[in-house]
Amino acid sequence: ALVTGLLPAILCKEKKESYTQPKVQFIKAIKSTISNKPFVFLTMTFICCLIGTFIISPLTLYILIYHVAEGDKSFGALLSGLGGWGFSVFQIILSRPTASLGNRWGKRNVLCLGIIIMASGYLLSWFLYTPNYPWLSIIPLPIMCIGSLCIYLLHGAMVADICDIDELESGFRRQGIFAAVTQFVYKSSIALSS
């Protein structure tokens, strides 16, 4: 793994234009990044989805054990494990089709569709988390997976598109500051929802 990780660092060279680009001050770069309206809108959407997901997800195990499984910890854990397994399998299977749909229908449209699908999965959990039919509680997680996959997969691609638009407008290639702000927002959202 170390060798394959080092090969791109050794063999791939940057373009010469990046060396001649004048340095931009950090505060000025942050201000211009935050003033980019498409980036702010995309980031706010990302924040809302992240905080919503990370606040609700830890409660799912407790709901499955104490409501759906009526206190049976092993059965509740089994339901949670099967749901998590389905979530992971669906993400692996649907990664390529989601990327293809993003290219065909437009990333924004697929992202909006994914958010709607994820919200419908959360709404379905209100009706499918029932002690009468406990196996139905597995259904919402793969549905939520589709929306989650759209958010995580297309968000990065959309930030790259915003970097390209910003370069056309400003003349500077500033994907580093966009990536830094995105990761700061991501980690802050997780910390805020913990």
Regions found by a protein language model. Name each.
Residues A1-S194:
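Membrane-embedded alpha-helical bundles of multi-pass transporters/translocases
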